[in-house]
Amino acid sequence: MAIETFQRGFVLHRKPYSETSLLVDLFTEETGRLTVLAKGARAKRSAWKGVLQPFTPLLLRWSGKGALKTLTKAEPAAIALPLQQTALFSGFYVNELLCRVIEAETPNGELFQDYLHCLTRLASEDGVEPALRTFEFQLLTMLGYGVDFTHCAGSGEPVDEAMTYRYREEKGFTASLIKDNATFYGRDLLAFEARDFRDPAVRSAAKRFTRMALKPYLGNKPLKSRELFAHNILFLK
């Protein structure tokens, strides 16, 4: 089955297939994530040479009924977003998250817009951490993660800015006198609810939380993008 019109999308990941082709993971506005076979994309005279790259807005068409579709058209919709250094590795991280946690061919136009907004922020001087944390929280919302950041899961009382709360998977946050890696100040939880990551302390707390919250979806397999960043960080300084 061939789609009749172009869809907006991005390349999330690509890898060689046979001598001249590519297997490409796409994220599109109307279909969501899907894998396509780009026949001849690695050939020297391929019309797609240099086109099927991450972070380039694309117009795409494909055909096929099974899990693996065949790419039929791909052309740039705009120039590539200029991600460099830390922002580039952060973009790879976001792409890997999408590949790992969202179901194939599950349309989500809102998440596509969140992804586009995240890449745009990464390409600007807005700061990497706020862009990543915002996207992670939006992704958790899409996955059906419904934690209440404004009330204690144990008592139902409103969160107190000065108190500490322990995160309990699938339950939420309960008041705790013990402070460790799984506890958060109430002021941080209220900032999470507002998606306000301007404060460095809030960003640090949000990073701890999203790592814990995403772990059930990611499993124990390490993220390759984190390993890539760790191996290259010395060259970025």
From Swiss-Prot:
Function as written in the Swiss-Prot or TrEMBL entry? Involved in DNA repair and RecF pathway recombination.
Describe the family membership recorded for this protein in Swiss-Prot or TrEMBL. Answer: Belongs to the RecO family.
The name this protein carries in UniProt is DNA repair protein RecO
Q: By its UniProt entry, which PANTHER family does this protein fall under?
A: DNA REPAIR PROTEIN RECO
Report TM segments: none
Magnesium: is it a keyword of this entry? no
Q: Which InterPro entries match?
A: ARFGAP/RecO, DNA_rep/recomb_RecO_N, NA-bd_OB-fold, RecO, RecO_C
Q: Which organism is it from?
A: Actinobacillus succinogenes (strain ATCC 55618 / DSM 22257 / CCUG 43843 / 130Z)
Ubl conjugation as a keyword of this entry, yes or no, is no
For biological process, the GO terms are:
DNA recombination; double-strand break repair
Gene Ontology CC annotations of this record:
bacterial nucleoid
Q: Which NCBIfam families match?
A: reco (TIGR00613)
Keyword list (alphabetical) reads:
DNA damage, DNA recombination, DNA repair
SUPFAM superfamilies in the record: ArfGap/RecO-like zinc finger, Nucleic acid-binding proteins
